[in-house]
Amino acid sequence: MFVDQIKIEVKAGKGGDGMVAFRREKYVPNGGPAGGDGGKGGSIILKVDQGLRTLMDFRYHRIFKAKPGQNGMIKGMYGRGADDTYISVPQGTTVTDAETGELLGDLVEADDELVVAKGGCGGRGNIKFASPKNPAPEIAENGEPGEERKLKLELKVLADVGLVGFPSVGKSTLLSVVTSAKPKIAEYHFTTLVPNLGMVRLDDGRDYVMADLPGLIEGASQGVGLGIQFLRHVERTRVILHLIDMSGVEGRDPYDDFVKINEELKVYDPTLLDRPQIVVASKMDMPDSAKNLAEFKVKLAKDKTLKQVPEVMEISSLTHQGLKELTHRTADVLESTPKFETLAEKEQASKVYTFKEDEPAFKITRDSDATWVLSGEKLERLFKMTNFNHDESLMRFARQLRGMGVDDALRERGVKGGDLVRIEDFTFEFVE
């Protein structure tokens, strides 16, 4: 089964907790702190695997978790950092944050990697908190939580040349003749349900990848037929071979086919019409094909759909008429056509930097049970990294809140001594 869109969840590993420990050695009185730092949590990294052709592996495995870092140990020993978790994806996968719509990366090269969730830093042990005023602190940090994200993966086939056209115009037959690909071929519409790739190798040493894309029909850009499900794959192609059935056996007018398919491409992405397009007049071995082609060329000469009138090449995949000329001409056009920017490059090129005020370190709201609720990314991070098993760590957290202005802000909101205040799942009394 061909799967080209999927949503997954990733969660990086939590950092290891720092340790509170003290040296207890003979002849070393008051040995001082000896708690080590925790190790870094594992990150989650997407990596291109050239052996994959679909996202089907993600259908039954959509949640990925990296391992946490090891906790700090006695004698100042650091915890081991966790190994990163690698997830293999096909070449041509775009990665988007499913909640914000932000494009995170476009994996188009064979060795591309993308960090989609960073592992948390390890918490500091009590060695790091020693000072002249407090030479033996009972303070240690918990490890930082790893990043969590919901991702949308979208595969766009990587091919130099894309075959487009109505169903049953001969796209799969052409691919099977000029490459070693074996697409399904039958005399009914939508025989091709997934993109098929093949390598065209010419006798002069040149080669390129050709993609047979499922047939389009009028309204495809609005979801008719197979809809835009496969239109996305045309985005990657540098040259478009537009196959048109000149035999007329389907009862359609070849010129109308040309206009309708280009209109669908335009609605989906207007820049597709800027790409080199060669009209491939197929099934030229049929009786009425020559007459239909002559009428088509007259209409095409007056057409303004594309910036310039496209070149027309006649072929018959059955008799192999014109195939050598077509494949060589396509290679010539490819050589003069630069590679298109990846989505990530386009995003970077068009990025507009604007001033954005920093989010407040904390927010104060009131719950329905009259409890005051503190929230905010910075405050919640401090809370999660505080080890409440030690009184000194708790006092340090209270000082941090005071330094952030939380106490004063609560008083301004009308909080009085004895009122309940909650941070995530931790509730305490406000003390004046």
Swiss-Prot record:
It is found in: Cytoplasm. Mg(2+) binds at residues 172, 192. Residues 159-335 form the OBG-type G domain. One of its GO terms (biological process) is ribosome biogenesis. It comes from the Bacteria. GO terms for cellular component: cytoplasm. Its EC number is 3.6.5.-. GO terms for molecular function: GTP binding; GTPase activity; magnesium ion binding. Residues 354-432 form the OCT domain. Transmembrane segments: none annotated. InterPro entries: G_OBG, GTP-bd, GTP-bd_Obg/CgtA, GTP-bd_prot_GTP1/OBG_C_sf, GTP1-OBG_CS, GTP1_OBG_dom, GTP1_OBG_dom_sf, OBG_GTPase. SUPFAM superfamilies: Obg GTP-binding protein C-terminal domain, Obg GTP-binding protein N-terminal domain, P-loop containing nucleoside triphosphate hydrolases. Its cofactor is Mg(2+). Keywords: Cytoplasm, GTP-binding, Hydrolase, Magnesium, Metal-binding, Nucleotide-binding. Residues 1-158 form the Obg domain. GTP binds at residues 165-172, 190-194, 212-215, 282-285, 316-318. Its main location: cytoplasm. Monomer. Belongs to the TRAFAC class OBG-HflX-like GTPase superfamily. OBG GTPase family. An essential GTPase which binds GTP, GDP and possibly (p)ppGpp with moderate affinity, with high nucleotide exchange rates and a fairly low GTP hydrolysis rate. Plays a role in control of the cell cycle, stress response, ribosome biogenesis and in those bacteria that undergo differentiation, in morphogenesis control. This is GTPase Obg. It comes from Ligilactobacillus salivarius (strain UCC118) (Lactobacillus salivarius).
